[in-house]
Amino acid sequence: MNLNSIPAFEDNYIWVLNDDEGKCLLVDPGEAEPVFRALEENQWQPVAILLTHHHHDHTGGVKALVARFPDITVYGPEETRSKGAQVVVNDGEKFNILGCEFLAFSTPGHTLGHFSYFSFPYLFCGDTMFSAGCGRLFEGTPAQMYQSFQKINALPEDTLICCAHEYTLSNLKFLVAILPDDPALTQYYREVNELRAKNQKTLPSILKNERQINLYLRLEDDDLIDKINPDLRLSTPEERFAWLRSKKDNF
C-alpha cells in the first residue's frame, strides 16, 4: 500500500492509501473538490472512506463523494452516522479494506465519540494526537484524552502518525517556550522550521520520535515535570495533561 495526502482547507490533510491497481481508501475527506482532482490526476478509484469524528472539516466531502462513487463504503463511529457513515464501527473492531486489516479503537477527547484506525504501520488518528501536540478538548475531558494517548503509545514505535492537521510548527513553538533547554525539542523545531519555510509537510510523524518530543506522552517523567512546573510534582498524569493543554489553549 502507498500513503499519500491531499491538502484541504488551510491546514488539513486528507490521507489516501492506494494499492498498485489504483484502488484507494480515503480518510476524513472534509471537502470533495481537492479529492476529485487528486483521484483524476492519479487515476485512483476510491472504495472506502474512514471517518474519525463528526466535525465538518473531516466529513464535509462525504456526500459528494458517495454521489459520484455510489459503491464506496463509509466507515465511522456512531457520531458520524448523520455525516454519511454507513458502517458504524465499535471499539476494538477489526475489518479489512483492500487486503489490509484495520483496528478501530475509541480515542475520545477532541470529541466524545472520536475513533482512530490502525493498520501497521499507519495510524489515522484524526484530531487526537498531532506531532508535538494534541487536539483541543471540545467535548471530552483531559483524563479521556490522556487515556487515548496511552492507547496510541502502546502501538509499535515505528507506527506512522497520520494526523489530520499541519500543526507541528505551532505545537513546537509552545513546547520550546516552556522547555527551552530540551535538545530533542530544539533540534526538531529547527528541522520543522526548515520544512515549513519550503512549504513542505511534516507528516506523517513516527511514534518513536513523538515519544521524544511530544510532552503529552512524557507526563509520567517527574524530572521533566520539575523543569516545566515543580508545583505539579505530586499531581497525577491526568492533572498534568490538563495543565499542559490549558497552557497551550492560552499560549
From Swiss-Prot:
Pfam families: HAGH_C, Lactamase_B. It is an enzyme of class 3 (hydrolase). HAMAP family: Glyoxalase_2 (MF_01374). Monomer. One of its GO terms (molecular function) is metal ion binding. Belongs to the metallo-beta-lactamase superfamily. Glyoxalase II family. Its cofactor is Zn(2+). Thiolesterase that catalyzes the hydrolysis of S-D-lactoyl-glutathione to form glutathione and D-lactic acid. It comes from Cronobacter sakazakii (strain ATCC BAA-894) (Enterobacter sakazakii). GO terms for biological process: methylglyoxal catabolic process to D-lactate via S-lactoyl-glutathione. Its EC number is 3.1.2.6. This is Hydroxyacylglutathione hydrolase. Disulfide bonds: none annotated. It catalyses: an S-(2-hydroxyacyl)glutathione + H2O = a 2-hydroxy carboxylate + glutathione + H(+). Zn(2+) 1 binds at H53, H55, H110, D127. Zn(2+) 2 binds at D57, H58, D127, H165. Pathway: Secondary metabolite metabolism; methylglyoxal degradation; (R)-lactate from methylglyoxal: step 2/2.
